[in-house]
Regions:
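Cleavable N-terminal export/targeting peptides
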Residues: 1-27
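Short glycine/proline- and aromatic-enriched beta-strand/turn motifs that initiate or cap beta-hairpins
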Residues: 21-84
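Predominantly the C-terminal beta-signal and adjacent terminal strand-loop region
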Residues: 23-25, 39, 43-45, 165-211
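Outer-envelope beta-barrel architecture signal
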Residues: 24-30, 87-91, 135-141, 186-188, ...
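Residues that define the transmembrane beta-barrel architecture of outer-membrane proteins
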Residues: 26-28, 70-76, 117-123, 137, ...
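Transmembrane beta-strands of outer-membrane beta-barrel pores
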Residues: 34-40, 95-101, 119, 145-153, ...
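Flexible, solvent-exposed loop segments that connect beta-strands
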Residues: 42-69, 97-121, 149-172
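Gram-negative (and chloroplast) outer-membrane scaffold detector with strong preference
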Residues: 71-154
């Protein structure tokens, strides 16, 4: 009858409100992410900066020197977000770190002559919008802009001489994660994002805690 229908509707509304309240109560969020690659801007500036000081020592390959053992650590980030009264909106910040390295050797003898490293430190205020925000599942987009500080260092052990040089540069940084998917229990979720920027290219993943 009508009374039963009304009671069912009210009960369903109460369950929905309660579920939303549970999500809204979790205002704070801390996450750790890992991504591979840097933006074209960041990689280009870092590469140019590293080459500028390395070429002065090794001749940029002009004098029988070649590079080898190139390593790319990827980008490790720490995120914090605060969820506003609107459960779909969160604001916060991102700290990121990435590093790359390579060694130099004589092209003929293959004798080690030195190395160079580039370290990237990123700080970005960020914004996240949830298209879906359920207790155990979320679908969102994320954007961030800020600055990346690059520290480049080259060491030379060529011809029995030990030399080193460093240089620093700052450039505009950003992250655009077009789509992110998270899932897990109420307070702990794993996630994966597809995007582009200082946190990684194409995809990055991690773990976040909400409280």
């Amino acid at each position: 009858d009508l009374n039963k229908i009304m009671m069912m509707v009210v009960a369903a509304m109460m369950v929905t409100v309660n579920a939303n309240a549970q999500v809204e109560d979790l205002r704070h969020e801390i996450g750790v992410t890992y991504g591979t690659g840097l933006s074209v801007v960041g990689d280009g500036i870092g590469e140019g900066l590293g080459l500028a000081i390395a070429n002065g020592m090794f001749g940029g390959g002009k004098f029988g020197t070649e590079t080898y053992d190139e390593k790319d650590f990827g980008t490790l980030s720490l995120e914090y977000f605060y969820h506003l009264n609107n459960p779909r909106v969160a604001i916060g910040g991102i700290l990121g770190y990435a590093t790359t390295s390579q060694k130099y050797r004589d092209q003929n003898s293959k004798v080690y002559e030195g190395d160079r490293t580039r370290s990237y430190y990123t700080v970005m205020p960020s914004f996240k919008y949830y298209w879906v925000n359920k207790e155990y599942f979320g679908l969102y987009s994320k954007a961030a802009i800020g600055a990346t500080f690059v520290h480049a260092k080259a060491n030379s052990e060529k011809d029995g001489k030990n030399e080193s040089a460093t240089e620093n540069k700052t450039y505009f940084a950003f992250q655009a994660s077009f789509i992110g998917v998270e899932g897990g229990i109420k307070n702990l979720r794993a996630f994966v994002e597809g995007g582009f920027g200082e946190q990684g290219i194409v995809a990055l993943g991690g773990l976040r805690v909400k409280f």
